[in-house]
Curated annotation (Swiss-Prot):
This is Heat shock 70 kDa protein. One of its GO terms (molecular function) is ATP binding. Keywords: ATP-binding, Nucleotide-binding, Stress response. Belongs to the heat shock protein 70 family.
Length: 257
């Protein structure tokens, strides 16, 4: 008896795009059955960034430079905003004919752009694919170290910029002593300056800088919020102790619109 067999096409390599630190963020993992469609939301890397470059890669390595570039396009017209604020939806859509459509859309404006990548242009050969898959284990330790460095760097960067945005908020700076604000500014500027360097230091250096930032900033910010909370509690206590006006008296003048 001959049994019916269902043959499924799968992606030979992972598909993704380049994100901060030159690493590949995978949207469609290797061996995913096609057709398939995946979406993920990304944001900008710098303040007031007017556009982003979407670079599409296939491969299994952590760094995009070790993978194969399939194509790229720009999404422009993003309104000026602090980093991490814009919401950009990226969609990878592979049809049954191996045609890969990659689109990006800014949620705020509806601005969008896309690229279509066919299976016969710029793709790796069967031999190259097999070689790349075999290299995954060979470079596993190296790739894990790179990813750890980039993740630690990104965490420090996010915290530093978050603190910078915090101390430039007028609602917050009005409650922050000038001396404390200056301390945070100097430490944050020093961290960002180090991050902007071309070198990728060891993980320990990023972790030490993060501890330095947190040990300085967290107590100052916590103290400020405690002061604000104390003021709110005081106001509530005063309101609770105030006469309620019960006893038949009508509304006082000025209380009626």
């Amino acid at each position: 008896k001959v049994q019916d067999l269902l043959l499924l096409d799968v992606t030979p390599l992972s598909l993704g795009l380049e994100t901060a630190g030159g690493v590949m963020t995978v949207l469609i993992p290797r061996n995913t059955t096609i057709p398939t469609k995946k979406e993920q939301v990304f944001s900008t890397y710098s303040d007031k960034e007017p556009g982003v470059l979407i670079q599409v890669f296939e491969g299994e390595r952590t760094r995009t430079r070790d993978n194969n570039l399939l194509g790229k396009f720009e999404l422009s017209g993003i309104p000026p905003a602090p980093r991490d604020v814009p919401q950009i939806t990226v969609c990878f859509d592979i049809d049954a004919n191996w045609c890969l459509n990659v689109s990006a859309e800014d949620k705020t404006t509806g601005q969008k752009n896309k690229i279509t990548i066919t299976n016969d242009k710029g793709r790796l050969s069967k031999e190259d694919i097999e070689k790349m898959v075999q290299e995954v284990e060979k470079y596993k330790a190296e790739d894990e170290e790179v990813k750890k460095k980039v993740d630690t760097k990104n965490a420090l960067e996010n915290y530093a910029y978050s603190m910078r945005n915090t101390i430039t908020d007028d609602k917050i700076t009005s409650k922050l002593p000038t001396e404390d604000k200056k301390k945070i500014e100097d430490t944050v500027d020093g961290a960002i300056s180090r991050l902007d360097g071309n070198q990728l230091p060891e993980v320990e250096e990023f972790e030490d800088k993060m501890k330095e930032l947190e040990s300085l900033c967290n107590p100052i910010i916590a103290k400020m919020y405690q002061g604000v909370l104390a003021q709110m509690v005081l106001v509530l206590l005063i309101m609770a102790d105030a006469p309620t006006g019960s006893g038949g008296a009508g509304p006082k003048i000025g209380e009626v619109d």
